[in-house]
Amino acid sequence: MMPLRILVWNADGVSTKLPEVECFVRRHEIDVLLLSETHCKGAETPKLFGFVAYTANDPSGGNAKGGAAILIKNSLAHFPLTPIATAKVQLAPAVIETALGPISFGAVYCPPRFAWTTDEFKDILEEFQTKFIVAGDWNASHWLWGAGRSNQRGIALANLVLNSEVDSLATGGPTRYPYGCRGSPGYIDFALTKGVLGIHANISAVVELSSDHLPLVITLDAGAISYPKMERLITRRTNLEVFQSQLESTLPLNTAINSGQDVDDAIELLTNNIKSAARLATRSISRQPAADRIPIPREILLLIAEKRRLRTRWMRSRHPSDKTEWNRALSRLRCALVLHKAAWFDERLANTGVESEATHSLWKATRAIKRRCTRKAPLVDSNGTWCRTDLGQAEVFAAHLAERFQPFKLASLQQVEETQDQLNQALQMDMPITPFEPCEVAEVIVRQSNNKAPGHDVICNATLKALPRQAILYITLVFNAIVRLQYFPYQWKLGIISMIHKPGKPEREPASYRPISLLPSISKVFERLIAVRIVSIMEAQGITPEHQFGFRAGHCTVEQLHRVVEQILTAYDSKEYCNSLFLDIREAFDRVWHIGLQLKIKQTLPAPYFGLLKSYLEGRRFAVRFHSAISTEHNVAAGVPQGSVLGPLLYCLYSHDMPQPDVSLYGKSMLATFADDVCVTYRSRCEHDAADGIQDFAYRFSEWARRWNIGINSSKSNNVCFTLKRRTPPPVYIEEVPVPQPNAAKYLGVLLDRRLTFSKHVTDIRTRLRAKVAKHYWLLSSRSKLSLSNKLTIYKQILAPNWKYGCQIWGLACDSHIKRIQAIQNKVARLITGCEWFVRNTTLHRDLKLATVFDEINKHSSRYHDRLERHRNRLASALNRSRPPRRLNRRQPRDLITRSPLTRVRRS
């Protein structure tokens, strides 16, 4: 096991010295960096490739000063402790898992202007565990660590070392050489340790890096534990012929599957044989160094050696001329490092593209921008206790999700008993489910994406695509047994959940993380096969309502937005109020009541599907994976399975009988749903009638939701009245709570304001688009060596979709708003070409073959309306045939097909 190597260094400002620090770390194979005097302000952290940083910055503000930081390799298992950031001391601690147990490490900086006592040093060290190494700039001198003269702080710290189990680890020589010639060398950089006496620890000073302090390297014979990497069964080193032949010889096709236990045994046999065959067919090789590391050429190594030689000479002579020579060598080295990194980066960009022949992938470069750094932060559990270890945080997440996967208790006891009684009634006999054919199974497997992560069985879609014909036949045999026995395998009911932090939410709260569930890939293949049969039954019987556009083939959000906007425009032309209610369903997919869902399945689908889906829902479990730890398993008492294929379909079935607006009472109403997004509109010339219509629907929807244990979040719902009049209808109440009445509401990603000007939506687009341009500036700027075609591809495929979404609807905005988007496109075109100010925007668009925003709106609108002509949903196809009255000079969505700047709209 490799020893752990720690760098201890007072950087005297680290931001400008990161290139040489990176070079030093690679040459000396450093695993942990303990930096002091980082000069970082606020939440600023030093960024080093392959390392994660935890800081304790000086809180006094003003000029950058002080500060400590610990940087740990991403691959090492660790967790941070609470930092100490006061004017008197800055301490950044973390715990690293090693072969000899957890060891605490801390980077410390003690400013020289404060007096210390032994008890104060003891207090800050008591925060650590039984084994720790705290190193940095203590500004304390004493003979214990080699100093000839002791100061007050050194005496206080030495008393702690002499009268406790704490030991000092120092080089015995000077570690600080002042820049001036008059100051004497100092002995103020060292480490305090505890519990590592039995471990061989060696410390040495290195004449490198550029500050008045020498870097210290601690070698600790306690190998660190790395995070386990996700196992990949099929790689480039896998011999597929060996893999397939091994599987064909181990999978028996004459297996008799007559019970649920037989199904579980068959799944276990299939999983184990696939794993063993893949491991047998994959040759193991030693891990190669990362290809994206910047190589260190011989010229830079010579400059480092020269700088080291000149610094050693100055440390001995302390002559100003030797100091000048050292500074010049340091400047040459820094310049060479910057130029070499820039040249390497330009060469890499020049060989980057979307073609298969390109050396580097353009999509990987842009994906790295989207990927957020996974910084570890401690969590607070329900008792207010801090949890820092991986296992502890995994258990906190699991406990939080276990509470979340519980049904609401909104239905009355009588309603619950009635539902249970109906569920217990005998089933009618029905035809069995049509068996699967091997060609069906093979077709579904081929269509699976290779980019999907596997479940707990680590069998990915690429592995399934490499299966031989005999394995496909065996899988078909198992699938048909599952359908025949109406038994869903036990192994497929376990989901591994990873938690993703929501931007802008507090890191210490479990509710600030979004769960992502990973299920076995083979189970998803089965779900896709059975989903095809369920969808055909639901469409034949008309179970899915026409107003539900979510999770349906051939449906999208733009069509539902079109329906809502058409109601608003019709109200404007008819001098009416269009009162709208946008409902927010609380944790819609996680709180589905299983008993109620099973009853609706029983009432709508044939009996064999009920038995199969009942087994599918019962006994489901989950565990949370957090870095290197996996929590204990918990039961799922509510909700549709996350990450599954059948989950969205089951939610649509669960909500298919929601109440409709009462058209006969108030008229001119519309209900639009997309998955769990519900919008209802009422049009009336009287604001009170419009409010009464919405209130009547809200009351009936609340009754229905309470009956089926569906929670409504009144505070997050919105009641917006779209009108050109000045009056506002009375507020709407849900469960005696008034619904907020803002001037705009976001529905399916588009901000709809009261007068439908789309000004707020255009402002939101510009904000997001400018932020994306800033993130991709290093790829798009004229100084980038990326080819012009690749820059244009980045804009078209990554940036432009931010404003193209919904342009068939928000394109109704006036020309001045559209030109605000066009202005950003003009700037991007000028950025990627580097053209001067006198080059016309029309010339840039013509030479780049880049369509204007107006042309793109026309093109997308034309395609959209052509699709509406052939749409299978009656409500969507009616959008093309309707001809509402036109009293105002406002555009309709169909007018965008031929729209151009400054065109007027004629009244019909």
From Swiss-Prot:
Pfam family, one: RVT_1
Record domain Reverse transcriptase: where: 481-752
Region annotation Disordered: where it falls in the sequence: 883-908
GO BP: DNA transposition
Membrane keyword on record: no
Keywords, comma-separated and alphabetical: Nucleotidyltransferase, RNA-directed DNA polymerase, Transferase, Transposable element
Enzyme class: transferase
CDD domains: RT_nLTR_like (cd01650)
Keyword Transferase in annotation: yes
Swiss-Prot/TrEMBL cofactor(s): Mg(2+); Mn(2+)
Record-listed E.C. numbers: 2.7.7.49
Reactions it catalyzes: DNA(n) + a 2'-deoxyribonucleoside 5'-triphosphate = DNA(n+1) + diphosphate
InterPro entries: DNA/RNA_pol_sf (IPR043502), Endo/exonu/phosph_ase_sf (IPR036691), Endo/exonuclease/phosphatase (IPR005135), RdDP_mobile_element (IPR052560), RT_dom (IPR000477)
Membrane-crossing residue ranges in chain numbering: none
Gene Ontology MF: a single term: RNA-directed DNA polymerase activity
More details: At least 30 copies of X-element are present in the genome and some elements are polymorphic between different strains.
Protein name (record): Probable RNA-directed DNA polymerase from transposon X-element
UniProt organism field: Drosophila melanogaster
Gene, per the UniProt record: X-element\ORF2
